């Protein structure tokens, strides 16, 4: 309990310090605890420290945790398999990893009307600096249009999975397009508010690049 409590306190202070440096409103930053491969006991400790948003990568692993802690916010941040879409749609509040229209339609189909709309993010993969912005943004626009048309999905923004970079400057260079994509979408969908970007290894670069949601695992559970 003490380690997780200490880790969360230290992490929040780090976020505050970075936010002051870049003049970011900390109220707009969401901390998501990545709980894949973490025990129920570890999750319980984090909840007792005030953490109420958790991210899972694997559908099967997530189910016992969600059933046990059904009063907190669960985010699906893993790859979506078509045969698991119904489980994601029925059990999570957020899905970060929509990459195509087929997946969006399936999630919409299986989302119960008795639940609030499923908050959704369009996943963007930034691998290098040779991407074709015009081609990519057109694909993203078409996917956003599809999501926006579906009754049971709520488009909230984008999620980025950049290629891992070692240095801060390399991270900044890799992430520079991400908020550009978000800004382009926001011109049409003014209500979107989320850029899911950043892990334990790149918090400063992520916040500098406009992240509003940090996906943190090891800095909470391992240190």
Swiss-Prot record:
GO MF term (any one): pyridoxal phosphate binding
Keywords associated with the record: Pyridoxal phosphate
Entries under InterPro entries matching the protein: Ala_racemase_N (IPR001608), PLP-binding_barrel (IPR029066), PyrdxlP_homeostasis (IPR011078)
Positions of post-translational N6-(pyridoxal phosphate)lysine modification: 36
Pfam family name, one: Ala_racemase_N
Superkingdom of this protein's organism: Bacteria
NCBIfam families, A to Z: YggS family pyridoxal phosphate-dependent enzyme
Family affiliation: Belongs to the pyridoxal phosphate-binding protein YggS/PROSC family.
HAMAP family registered for this protein in UniProt: PLP_homeostasis
Role according to the record: Pyridoxal 5'-phosphate (PLP)-binding protein, which is involved in PLP homeostasis.
Assembly notes: Monomer.
Name of the featured protein: Pyridoxal phosphate homeostasis protein
Organism: Buchnera aphidicola subsp. Baizongia pistaciae (strain Bp)
């Amino acid at each position: 309990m003490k380690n997780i409590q200490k880790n969360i306190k230290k992490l929040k202070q780090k976020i505050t310090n970075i936010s002051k440096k870049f003049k970011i409103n900390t109220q707009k930053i969401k901390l998501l605890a990545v709980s894949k491969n973490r025990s129920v006991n570890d999750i319980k400790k984090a909840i007792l420290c005030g953490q109420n948003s958790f991210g899972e990568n694997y559908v099967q692993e997530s189910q016992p945790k969600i059933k046990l802690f059904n009063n907190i916010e669960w985010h699906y941040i893993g790859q979506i398999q078509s045969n698991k879409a119904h489980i994601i749609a029925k059990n999570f509040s957020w899905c970060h990893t929509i990459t195509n229209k087929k997946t969006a339609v399936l999630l919409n189909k299986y989302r119960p009307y008795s639940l609030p709309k499923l908050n959704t993010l369009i996943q963007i993969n930034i691998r290098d600096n040779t991407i074709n912005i015009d081609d990519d943004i057109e694909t993203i626009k078409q996917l956003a249009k599809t999501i926006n048309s579906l009754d049971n999905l709520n488009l909230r923004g984008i999620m980025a999975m950049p290629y891992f970079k070692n240095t801060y400057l390399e991270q900044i260079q890799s992430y520079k397009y991400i908020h550009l994509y978000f800004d382009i979408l926001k011109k049409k969908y003014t209500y979107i508010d989320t850029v899911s970007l950043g892990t334990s290894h790149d918090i400063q670069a992520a916040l500098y690049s406009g992240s509003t949601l940090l996906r943190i695992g090891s800095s909470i559970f391992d240190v």
